[in-house]
C-alpha cells in the first residue's frame, strides 16, 4: 500500500502542475519493490504497479513490475504492449486489473499458473489507486501459492476432519489432507447435500473464499 500511496501522491502533484508523470517517476519505486521481494519471510513472487492507459506522458500502457528470478535476483517483468502484435498483452481485460477498476475494491484472483514460465500456481492480490476519486491504476502482488498454503495449514491441520479452503471458482487454495492438491477443482467437495458437509463463507470480500469441512477423517500427508 505504501507504493500505491506514493504513486497516487506523485500523480496528484503532477496534476497540480498541469502535467502527467513519466515512466521514470515510477522506476524510482524499484528500491521499495526490491525490499518487499527480498524479505526473508516473503511469499511474494512479483509485485508492482500497473497504470490505466494514458496516465503517463511518455507511454500509453505501462507497468512497473518486478519478480524473483534465478538465484534470488530481482528482474523486471517485460510484456508486449504493441496492439498490432499477436502477443499483445492487454492487462485491461485481466480480472486483477478490471475488477478493482470496476468495483473500487481490493481483490484476490486465482489460483492460476503464473506468467513467469515457472509453472507455479499464484494468487494475485490487487488494490485500486485513485487520485481525487479517479481510477489511475492498481498496485498488486503475486503470491506463490505453495508458500501461502503453509500459512493457512497452521490452522487447517488442527481439524480432525478433511478441510480445505477454496476460491470463488472452486479451486483449492489449501487443504489439510493428501486427497487434495492446490489448484485442484473441488466443486464436488462443496456438495451441501453430503451429510455432515459444511461450507462456511470466510467473509473476506476481496477473496470470496470458503472453508469446506467434509464428514470424512483427514488423510495425513505422506500417508500411503
Residue ranges and their predicted role:
Residues 40-42, 92-107, 191-207:
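Soluble sensory domains of the PAS superfamily and closely related sensory modules
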Residues 42-103, 173-180:
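Extracellular/periplasmic ligand-sensing ectodomains of membrane signal-transduction proteins
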Residues 118-152, 214, 221-224:
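Conserved beta-strands of PAS-like sensory domains
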Residues 142-175:
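Solvent-exposed, extracytoplasmic
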Amino acid at each position: 500500500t505504501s507504493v500505491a500511496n506514493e504513486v497516487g501522491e506523485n500523480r496528484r502533484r503532477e496534476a497540480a502542475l498541469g502535467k502527467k508523470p513519466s515512466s521514470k517517476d515510477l522506476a524510482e519505486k524499484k528500491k521499495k519493490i526490491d525490499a518487499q521481494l527480498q524479505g526473508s519471510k516473503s511469499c511474494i513472487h512479483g509485485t508492482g504497479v500497473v497504470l490505466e492507459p494514458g496516465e503517463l506522458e511518455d507511454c500509453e500502457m505501462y507497468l512497473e513490475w518486478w519478480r524473483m528470478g534465478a538465484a534470488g535476483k530481482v528482474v523486471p517483468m517485460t510484456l508486449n504492449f504493441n496492439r498490432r502484435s499477436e502477443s499483445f498483452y492487454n492487462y485491461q481485460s485481466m480480472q486483477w486489473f478490471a475488477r478493482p477498476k470496476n468495483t473500487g475494491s481490493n481483490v484476490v484472483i486465482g489460483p492460476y499458473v503464473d506468467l513467469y514460465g515457472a509453472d507455479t500456481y499464484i494468487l494475485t492480490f490487487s488494490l485500486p489507486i485513485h487520485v481525487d476519486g479517479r481510477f489511475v491504476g492498481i498496485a498488486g502482488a503475486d503470491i506463490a501459492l505453495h508458500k501461502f498454503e503453509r500459512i493457512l495449514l497452521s490452522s487447517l491441520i488442527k481439524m480432525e476432519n478433511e478441510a480445505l479452503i477454496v476460491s470463488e471458482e472452486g479451486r483449492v487454495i489449501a487443504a489439510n489432507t493428501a486427497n487434495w492438491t492446490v489448484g485442484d477443482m473441488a466443486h464436488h467437495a462443496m456438495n451441501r447435500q453430503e451429510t455432515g458437509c459444511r461450507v462456511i463463507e470466510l467473509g473476506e470480500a476481496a477473496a470470496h473464499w470458503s472453508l469446506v469441512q467434509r464428514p470424512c477423517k483427514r488423510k495425513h500427508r505422506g500417508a500411503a
